[in-house]
Amino acid sequence: SLLFSFQAWSSQILVPMDEAQRDHLKAYGLAYWTLENQITIDWLLNYRGGSFLIPHLQRIEEELLLRNISYQVLADGQVNKIKSEIADPEVNMEVVQLEKAPKIAVYTPPNKLPWDDAVTLVLTYAEIKYDKIYDSAIVNGILPKYDWLHLHHEDFTGQYGKFYSSARMQSWYQQEVQRSEAAAAKLGFESTAALKRAVALNIRDRKSTR
């Protein structure tokens, strides 16, 4: 942890997530980075777009400037006023304390580059750490390692997707089918459909145990 090397002041940093924020993705990445360094932050749900309240530490402020993230330094009195506003039962707001950076996995083929996938592109830009995992890792029991698994609009039927009717005779499509069947066989499954079913069941079972 870098916490003990940070110089602190008697104030807090508000990272707004409304239209005042220059870079929302980088702001989320900054929140993740802060949690990685074992510093607890407050997530102000429905307050200015779901803003973050972070201890005013010199190293954090330097990081905010480096990443060109909009922020405000607030005195304790200003912070208390905001929290009182959020606590009003007439408003739909809440303070959620965040203590730990989640371990994130994205279900995506290992040969897909970050810029070919919208989710990994966003996470890479935001500087949020993630692992790419795919079928073999899931059927071998890796899911308990992660707090959050991102799925796209996946087809777990093993039917090779929406291109079957138009591209099934194309060489690139047939090669993809062969690769998929070979990967399934290597893992001990009789077909891609059987492998995809096992993957889907692993994901479902992991979700039900959380």
Language model feature labels by segment:
Residues S10-K26:
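Short N-terminal segments immediately surrounding and downstream of signal-peptide cleavage
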Residues K207-T209:
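Conserved small/polar residues in nucleotide/adenosyl-binding loops
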Residues S5-F6:
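N-terminal signal peptide c-region/cleavage motif recognized by signal peptidases
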Residues I60-V73:
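Short amphipathic alpha-helices in soluble, non-transmembrane regions
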Residues L45-Y47, L66:
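Trp/Gly-enriched beta-strand/coil motifs that build multi-repeat beta-propeller-like domains
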Residues Q21, K26-L30, E36-I39, Y47-H56, ...:
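Aromatic-Pro/Gly-enriched surface loop or interdomain linker
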Residues I41-W43, Y71:
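A structural signal for short hydrophobic beta-strand segments in well-ordered beta-sheet cores
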